[in-house]
Structures are given as structure tokens and as C-alpha cells.
């Protein structure tokens, strides 16, 4: 069994203690992170290495960015969705692992927020992104695990966290 955790960390360098707590409590094989908010050049390798993980990151300074920490070394890593309009936002990373059951792709994404259905730019961008990632996944010829911050709610009437006590 593979134990996978997906976590919007909202700033990797600010929350290594949360990763330590996740590792201690759940002992995951893979941690998929969103909103790492650190460029590839400034990525702190000590954070995953101190936890016993290999790391694969695709980020930029200050916002967005994704990473996969894994105990095993993947056979392949893909950063981005092949040159689309989202590439400057660093929203997708994929690591492929060879297992006893064949190749498994861990696909990790920080999906666009979209604002609301009537927003003239953000919602159409979100719709295009979902179509692109769906097309990408449909073209994979192996098992997948899709992780990430999907930026969706189950029901349109779901309350905002600000409205909850």
C-alpha cells in the first residue's frame, strides 16, 4: 500500500513544522504540496531531505507552485502541461513510479480559483485549465492518482469558511 498526502501548504518555508507533524503522524510515502511559493532556484532542499524524502518541485517566488516529496525515486518527472498559458504559474507536476502493479503517475496540481462563473477572465481560464489537465490525464496509458487543491466546492450553496463559527 502507498500512503499519499495532498496538502496546500501556503508557503513551504513558513511551515516545515507542519510537514514534520504529518510525517510523524501518518508516515506517508508521498506528499503532494500546493502553493509552495518558492522558486526552483531558492527551493530549500533541507526541508524534504531532513524528512527522508526525495523532492521534485516546480515553483516561483511568492505564489503558486507545486512539489512532490517521495521516498522512492520516480522513473520520470513532468513539470507543467506542455507549454500552455498556465506554465508561468507553475501549477502542475507529475512523478511516474514503477510499482508491482505497473506504472503509476502521481499528478499534482494547484487548480485556478476562478473567482465566480461570471468573471470574464478568471473563470474561463479555470475552465480551460480543467480541460487541459483532463486531456493530459486522458492521454496517460497507466494508472494515476490525481492530487491537489482543486479550488472547487461540492455545492454552490456551500458556506464560505468566513461564514462559519
Each predicted region: which residue ranges?
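Acidic/histidine-rich, metal-coordinating catalytic segments
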Residues: 142-155
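Structured beta-strand-rich core segments of catalytic domains in phosphoester-bond hydrolases
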Residues: 36-114, 118
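Active-site-proximal beta-strand elements of phosphoester/diester hydrolases
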Residues: 2-11, 103-116, 147
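N-terminal, active-site-proximal structural segment of metallo-dependent hydrolase catalytic domains
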Residues: 1-49, 53-54, 63-66
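Active-site flanking residues adjacent to catalytic metal/cofactor-binding acidic residues
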Residues: 7, 34, 147-149, 164
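Single conserved hydrophobic/aromatic residue that forms the stacking wall/gate
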Residues: 156-165
Amino acid at each position: 500500500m502507498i500512503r499519499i498526502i495532498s496538502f496546500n501548504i501556503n508557503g513551504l518555508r513558513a511551515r516545515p513544522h507542519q510537514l514534520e507533524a504529518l510525517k510523524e503522524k501518518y508516515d506517508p510515502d508521498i506528499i503532494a504540496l500546493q502553493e509552495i511559493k518558492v522558486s526552483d532556484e531558492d527551493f530549500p532542499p533541507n526541508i524534504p531531505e531532513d524528512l527522508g524524502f526525495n523532492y521534485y518541485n516546480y515553483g516561483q517566488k511568492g505564489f503558486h507552485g507545486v512539489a512532490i516529496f517521495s521516498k522512492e525515486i520516480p522513473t520520470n518527472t513532468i513539470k507543467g502541461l506542455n507549454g500552455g498559458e498556465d506554465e508561468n504559474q507553475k501549477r502542475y507536476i507529475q512523478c511516474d513510479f514503477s510499482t508491482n502493479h505497473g506504472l503509476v503517475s502521481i499528478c499534482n496540481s494547484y487548480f485556478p480559483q476562478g473567482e465566480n462563473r461570471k468573471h470574464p477572465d478568471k473563470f474561463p481560464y479555470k475552465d480551460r485549465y480543467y480541460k487541459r489537465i483532463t486531456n493530459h490525464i486522458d492521454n496517460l496509458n497507466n494508472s494515476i492518482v490525481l492530487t491537489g487543491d482543486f479550488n472547487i466546492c461540492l455545492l454552490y450553496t456551500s458556506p464560505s469558511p468566513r461564514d462559519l463559527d
